[in-house]
């Protein structure tokens, strides 16, 4: 028994077990619903989970911190617009469940009473974080120690900090790789309301793996004549015609599942090739560009100042807490 205990203790499982013991006792005595209600989620609890959805691959610490501020800003903005924490967690949980394979998330599920209320508890562990999510009437114990440890630390260091424009929470977009220059909000949305999203240079993105992507589509499946009509100052297509019918560039990009709206069109035999630069919509924070800045010594504050020069970092208190 002593030998088993020493092995259990040295394995690193002892501390997580002790930390979860009160929670397990609460479930045994009062039921799982009571336990989860006693540990309802807060904005800071959501941030590491949102990072699991928003970030792909490995990123430097300062880049993750920058994304943490963006994620937190998104939560507070959505809460301010009337969404509930449960609705946001519902969406995040569903996204995590859909991406658990690529993110190497281990899941253990067990059926429970079907309720519409989504409850949540997150517990800090010595080797990272694990969390219990109730989604669609099922309890899920998820753990992705390597990532959640990094994401949890980024959330803690930047706790309470959000991006604002003139003291107000605004849309703070991000994308994986720009075409070498991020887009201007006014040009994309055709509204001065988004003028705080300025186009900035992100030339390091041109060196990113996957910067250039080709998509081939049978010509028979496309309109006979596709013509790019307008591009914005960053090179992204804003308008094109399909057999004379006008289409919006980003809408076309999403409908065709193209990597980016900075594309050219070329006929190749019986196929049409779309040659795309960058990945994503190109607005706001370039994750690749920010990561390259972080690797060269830039802080998360400097990264955000670069990609959001019109915005400021402010500290907020958790709403309703």
Located regions from the model:
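Conserved, single-site charged/polar hotspot
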Residues: 1-321
């Amino acid at each position: 028994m002593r030998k088993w205990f020493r092995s259990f203790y040295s394995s690193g499982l002892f501390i997580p077990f002790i930390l979860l013991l009160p929670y397990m006792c609460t479930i045994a005595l009062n039921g799982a619903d009571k336990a989860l209600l006693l540990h309802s989620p807060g904005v800071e609890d959501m941030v590491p989970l949102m990072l699991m959805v928003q970030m792909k691959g490995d990123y430097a610490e300062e880049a993750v911190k920058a994304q943490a501020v963006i994620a937190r800003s998104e939560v507070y903005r959505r809460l301010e617009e009337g969404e509930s924490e449960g609705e946001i967690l519902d969406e995040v949980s569903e996204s995590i469940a859909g991406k658990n394979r690529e993110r190497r998330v281990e899941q253990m599920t067990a059926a429970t009473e079907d309720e519409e209320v989504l409850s949540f508890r997150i517990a800090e562990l010595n080797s990272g974080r694990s969390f219990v999510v109730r989604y669609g009437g099922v309890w899920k114990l998820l753990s992705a120690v390597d990532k959640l440890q990094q994401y949890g630390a980024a959330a803690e260091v930047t706790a309470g900090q959000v991006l604002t424009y003139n003291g107000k929470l605004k849309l703070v977009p991000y994308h994986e790789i720009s075409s070498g220059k991020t887009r201007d909000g006014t040009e994309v949305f055709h509204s001065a309301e988004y003028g705080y999203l300025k186009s900035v240079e992100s030339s390091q993105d041109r060196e990113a793996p996957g910067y250039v992507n080709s998509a081939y589509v049978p010509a028979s499946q496309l309109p006979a004549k596709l013509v790019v009509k307008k591009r914005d100052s960053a090179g992204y297509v804003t308008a094109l015609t399909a057999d004379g019918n006008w289409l919006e560039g980003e809408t076309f990009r999403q409908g065709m599942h193209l990597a980016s709206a900075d594309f050219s069109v070329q006929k190749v035999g019986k196929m049409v090739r779309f040659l795309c630069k960058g990945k994503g919509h190109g607005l706001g924070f370039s994750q690749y560009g920010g990561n390259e800045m972080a690797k060269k010594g830039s802080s998360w504050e400097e990264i955000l100042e670069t990609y959001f020069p019109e915005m400021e970092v402010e500290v907020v208190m958790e709403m309703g807490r």
